[in-house]
Structure formats: structure tokens, C-alpha cells
From Swiss-Prot:
Mg(2+) binds at residues 27, 57. It catalyses: sn-glycerol 1-phosphate + (2E,6E,10E)-geranylgeranyl diphosphate = sn-3-O-(geranylgeranyl)glycerol 1-phosphate + diphosphate. Sn-glycerol 1-phosphate binds at residues 175-181, 206-207, 228-229. It is found in: Cytoplasm. It comes from the Archaea. NCBIfam families: GGGP, GGGP-family, PRK04169.1-2, PRK04169.1-6. It holds the Pfam family PcrB. This is Geranylgeranylglyceryl phosphate synthase.
Length: 252
């Protein structure tokens, strides 16, 4: 049996307490000014973000990744790599979402990249968090790069089938991804349906722009939400999303 690491235990504790997890996604491609990143990260940390995800769909240099992780070391929440490929790995992070793109037609994204990365992850002592990655609806760049057969927004039954498969293969999380900057999020109805039939912990990301939609997704059964674009375009709204998620926890 695999023993959970420090980051996985931290996340599981939040879930066990009924507290929604908020991941702040930092895309190294879009960070132009390290000093500005420090201010943004400080605002997110003070608002109560649970962890930082670091990653992007397109290529990122190791040097840029390490410089961002160095800035984030000032904040006492986990720094978790959200990998687009095996180059996005660093010993400066606390953990990595060790993901399989479940609905890809390309075996590289299902298992090939994972085989290539596994020895590196082991060697540098990076904590892996087993995660199924499922692209839904719009999909965006992630769907194009990953050659995914996207799950339609209105087909929750198909999402359940993937969720059960991920659960039965021992994955701890299923990340339902609508795509960066998607015109709509994964629908709350899909989240609720998947939560009804599968016990896997659901992460939902893509297109989350308002506190109201964030609350809907949490109440539907999402254990964690990821916001990225809204952090880049409207930090005050991102903070309101975090605060709204915390109110759900306090009220319930």
C-alpha cells in the first residue's frame, strides 16, 4: 500500500473536515514580472487559497519554473506541479499531480509521459498525487495538445464511467477540466451526477469566473476548484471566489 505524503495528507484533512480546497493556478508562460507575482501570491495566500498549482499547457523552461517556485516558497501552503509535459518537474515543489489524460487518443498522454517522468519524480523525492485528468466541453488548448475526445457538457453518464474507471484504478482525484478560459465551466449537474455514483475526489477547473458559480460547484460535490485566468485578469474577483468558498464551509 502506498503511504500518503505530507501534501496528500494535508489535502485529505481539508476534505475530511468538509472544507473546499482552492487551488491558485500560476501559469509560468503568463508570468512576466516576478515581483508582481509575489504581490499576487501574497493576496491569494491572505485570502485563504489552499495551495498553489504551477503549470501551463505550453512549454515552460526549468529556469522559469524554478524562479516561480522560489517566489512561492514565502507562503506556507503546498506548491504543486500541474504538468503539461515531463519538462515541468522541479525539486523545489512539494508535490506533483501525477496525471493520466484519460480521454486522450494519444497513449503518450495516457501513460507514456508518466513512464518517462516516474524515475525523475522518484529520484528528486517529489510527492506524486495520483490523478485522472478528464477534459470536458470546450477543452481549449489542453484538448488540442492532448488529442482528447472531449466529454460533452451534457453527457454526465460518460463522465461517471471515466470517474469509476479512475477510482477503480486507485487514483485519488479526478480533475474535470473545461479548459483554460473556457466560455463555461463544467456544469454543476455533471459534478453532482459524478459525485452520486463515484467516491473519487473531484477537482473542477476551467471557466470559473464568479463566486456564485464556485459555490454552485462546491455544493454539487466538487472537493476542489482551480482558478487561473481570473487571477490574471481580475485578482479582486479571484479573492471573492476564495472567500465565497470559505463561507460555504463555515455555514455548512
Amino acid at each position: 500500500m502506498r503511504i500518503k505524503g505530507k501534501t496528500a495528507k494535508y489535502l485529505q484533512k481539508l476534505i475530511d473536515e468538509g472544507q473546499p480546497i482552492h487551488f491558485s493556478l500560476i501559469d509560468p508562460d503568463k508570468v512576466k514580472d516576478i515581483q508582481s507575482l509575489s504581490k499576487v501570491a501574497s493576496s491569494l495566500f491572505k485570502a485563504g487559497t489552499s495551495a498553489f498549482l504551477i503549470g501551463g499547457t505550453l512549454g515552460v523552461s526549468k529556469e522559469k519554473l524554478d524562479s516561480i517556485l522560489s517566489v512561492l516558497q514565502d507562503f506556507s501552503v503546498p506548491k504543486i506541479i500541474f504538468p503539461s509535459n515531463i519538462n515541468l518537474i522541479s525539486e523545489k515543489a512539494d508535490a506533483i499531480l501525477f496525471m493520466s489524460l484519460l480521454n486522450s487518443d494519444d497513449l503518450y498522454y495516457v501513460i507514456g509521459a508518466q513512464v518517462s517522468a516516474s524515475i525523475i519524480v522518484k529520484t528528486i523525492g517529489l510527492e506524486p498525487i495520483p490523478t485522472g485528468y478528464l477534459i470536458v466541453g470546450h477543452g481549449g488548448t489542453a484538448a488540442h495538445i492532448g488529442r482528447a475526445r472531449v466529454v460533452p457538457y451534457d453527457n454526465p453518464e460518460l463522465a461517471v464511467a471515466y470517474a469509476l474507471a479512475a477510482e477503480y484504478m486507485g487514483m485519488e482525484y479526478l480533475y474535470l477540466e473545461a479548459g483554460s478560459g473556457a466560455p463555461d465551466t463544467v456544469r454543476p449537474e455533471m459534478v453532482k451526477f459524478v459525485s452520486k455514483y463515484s467516491e473519487i475526489n473531484l477537482i473542477v477547473g476551467g471557466g470559473i469566473r464568479t463566486p456564485e458559480r464556485a459555490v454552485e460547484l462546491v455544493k454539487a460535490g466538487a472537493k476542489a476548484l482551480v482558478t487561473g485566468n481570473v487571477i490574471e485578469t481580475d485578482i479582486e474577483r479571484a479573492i471573492k471566489i476564495i472567500e465565497a468558498m470559505q463561507r460555504v464551509y463555515r455555514i455548512e
